[in-house]
Amino acid sequence: MGATLLFCMALLAGCAPSSPGPSKAGEAFKKEVLAVRDSLAPALMDAVAKREPRSTKKILEQSCALAGEGGNPFACGITILDSHGITLASATPGEPIKRLDYSRYEVVMTALKERKVVKTRLFLQDGTRLYVVAIPLVSKGESIGLLGLAFDASDLRNRFGLTEDEFMRVDLNG
């Protein structure tokens, strides 16, 4: 009797639904995030490690221009932070650099301390919903800065059909 009960419980556990796998929209979003990261991070590492705003801004502007010329402009806002959460550069064209302090933002400090990609959603004052991805820039096991990507949620829904739930389920650390 005990063996039969144990067998039935094992069978039921094996039949339990598994957590949903990544959706096509989630996979498309992940591919875009990784492409932006792979395009920007290697070029930025030295300037970010030295906390050089001018060099960081120049590299970011050149990378954005190259992506646009190649027919694949970055479809997100980009902010580069130093290891203390202070802005080194931003991809907003024509805007003067503002050394904003993001060190009080949990998403920023978590990504820097744990050296892993962290996602969150933010709401602007006008109601615009943003999906933010904080990617630590790591050199020799130490966080030297952060690559912050901000995507307009409605743009991602239009391009990929990505929902908020799918965004939150995307694993960018694997």
Describe each PLM feature range.
Residues 52-74, 104, 150-174:
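Solvent-exposed, extracytoplasmic
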Residues 53-57, 93-123, 162-166:
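Extracytoplasmic/periplasmic sensor domains and loops in membrane signaling proteins
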